[in-house]
């Protein structure tokens, strides 16, 4: 935003989020860039963590089962976690599954553990969970940061998107 203009006209951002300079300066001082999630919505309702404990436990068990399937190279079990309408970076489930199979069979690839798991859940048209985590190969100190979008579907949670942050 130009310094002479405090706010932008409605719909002048072409789909981007516009924040007034003083607010942006406060955000920069307050949050850790690339690790603090930003939620944008019409109606946000904060819920006490203890009210969500059982739901978090149930989803965490699902995520751990996904992790175990990937760690152990069980590709058929792993692919059961992905929704039929999955898409990621222009790949449908079929294309993505070929990449995933190649990753699992790559010589020298090490099993990985999840670290710094962040979960954000909301319900609008669908019950959605965003899981962001570090995927650290065993014996390494650093890895990659993965973000997955899961939706609760008949039969359980399914991944509808997966990509690197």
Predicted regions mapped to residue ranges:
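Exported/periplasmic cell-wall-interacting domains
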Residues: 1-64
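Extracytoplasmic/secreted envelope proteins and their assembly/folding machinery
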Residues: 16, 21-28, 60-63, 67, ...
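A mature extracytoplasmic/lumenal domain signature
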Residues: 23, 31, 42-44, 82, ...
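Loop/turn elements at helix/coil->beta-strand transitions in domains of secreted/extracellular proteins
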Residues: 34-36, 75, 156
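A structural boundary/capping signal
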Residues: 48, 70, 112-114
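Short, well-ordered alpha-helical segments enriched in acidic and aromatic residues
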Residues: 72-89
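Surface-exposed, charged secondary-structure patches
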Residues: 99-147
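Short beta-strand edge/turn micro-motifs at domain boundaries
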Residues: 140-165
